[in-house]
From Swiss-Prot:
Residues 15-50, 51-86, 91-126, 127-160 form the EF-hand domain. Ca(2+) 3 binds at residues 104, 106, 108, 110, 115. Pfam families: EF-hand_7. Gene3D superfamilies: EF-hand. This is Troponin C, skeletal muscle.
Length: 160
């Protein structure tokens, strides 16, 4: 078992591994311990993942190193964990987008110093003008006096 495969197993509960194994085994018709790359998308969708054709091609290219056209269960686990992490990343970005919309009170696509101060006041935090200025300086990478969504995402990376 490679380090990558051991890490994938450590990320999953025994229950999840058993669920993945059951799905994997359904497509391992001959019981040989591997499935064809063609069946991979079907198995992933059955397990609640939604890879695009491009994502599936990229995943398969990474996993099927020997070009055999088959993927064993350990390779499958590594791939599923990768896909789960990608899905989680997408969800957290959606949540951050919702936060940004709430913070952007005037809906102009930016958080300005007044809106930032209002966020803290609404949460009961007392912040000084200097603290707001410092936060703006940290988040406002292009120095236009306001924080756009990309700057907000970068700012929030350190918080999560």
């Amino acid at each position: 078992m490679t380090d990558q495969q051991a890490e994938a197993r450590s990320y999953l509960s025994e229950e999840m591994i058993a669920e993945f194994k059951a799905a994997f085994d359904m497509f391992d018709a001959d019981g040989g311990g591997d499935i064809s790359v063609k069946e991979l998308g079907t198995v992933m969708r059955m397990l609640g993942q939604t890879p695009t054709k491009e994502e599936l091609d990229a995943i398969i290219e990474e996993v099927d190193e020997d070009g055999s056209g088959t993927i064993d269960f350990e390779e499958f686990l590594v791939m599923m964990v990768r896909q789960m992490k990608e899905d989680a990343k997408g969800k957290s970005e959606e949540e951050l987008a919702e936060c940004f919309r709430i913070f952007d009170r005037n809906a102009d696509g930016y958080i300005d110093p007044e809106e930032l101060a209002e966020i803290f006041r609404a949460s009961g935090e007392h912040v000084t003008d200097e603290e707001i200025e410092s936060l703006m300086k940290d988040g406002d990478k292009n120095n236009d006096g306001r924080i756009d969504f990309d700057e907000f995402l970068k700012m929030m990376e350190g918080v999560q």
